[in-house]
């Protein structure tokens, strides 16, 4: 999946018929298979090689969210802890950028961030790009265990 400009704001955009313009961002969501296992990566790049100040600011928020989530991926933590970390960082960043107004705690509780960040931070990865496996067991978030493979790919849509 490769898209740019406003089309990069459409989750899993497929048409692929728009021209790439200077000032746009290009979103690449790609994967491959190797020896029966899947890979998945999502990255964003400026078309002309340089972020605008606004693009860079939002890119930095998402990068901080990704790093915060990665820090939560460890045995004993639950599936939801990396996602919760991204929600906190992204909500705080959207407030700092003036895209959300209010108190961080209230905006998270009301899910106001979902106007910009409407999906989960990642998914299981294995023999399929979106591999099988429960995220909850008996209504509780699943604990992460050694050997589990998951993606951490927060995205914002503005």
What function would you assign to each model-found segment?
Residues 1-158:
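Active-site neighborhoods and metal-handling regions in enzymes and metal-associated proteins
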């Amino acid at each position: 999946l490769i898209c740019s400009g406003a089309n990069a704001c459409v989750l899993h955009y497929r048409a692929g018929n728009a021209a790439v313009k200077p000032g746009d961002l290009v979103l690449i969501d790609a994967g491959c298979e190797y020896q029966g296992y899947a890979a998945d990566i999502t990255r964003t790049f400026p078309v002309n090689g340089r972020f605008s100040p606004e693009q860079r600011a939002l890119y930095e928020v998402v990068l901080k969210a990704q790093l915060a989530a990665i820090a939560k991926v460890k045995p004993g933590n639950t599936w939801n802890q990396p996602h919760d970390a991204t929600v906190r960082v992204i909500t705080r960043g959207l407030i700092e950028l003036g895209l959300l107004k209010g108190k961080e705690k209230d905006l998270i509780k009301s899910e106001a961030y979902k106007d910009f960040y409407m999906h989960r931070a990642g998914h299981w990865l294995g023999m399929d790009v979106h591999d099988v496996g429960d995220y909850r067991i008996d209504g509780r978030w699943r604990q992460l265990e050694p050997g589990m493979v998951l993606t951490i790919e927060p995205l914002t849509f503005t």
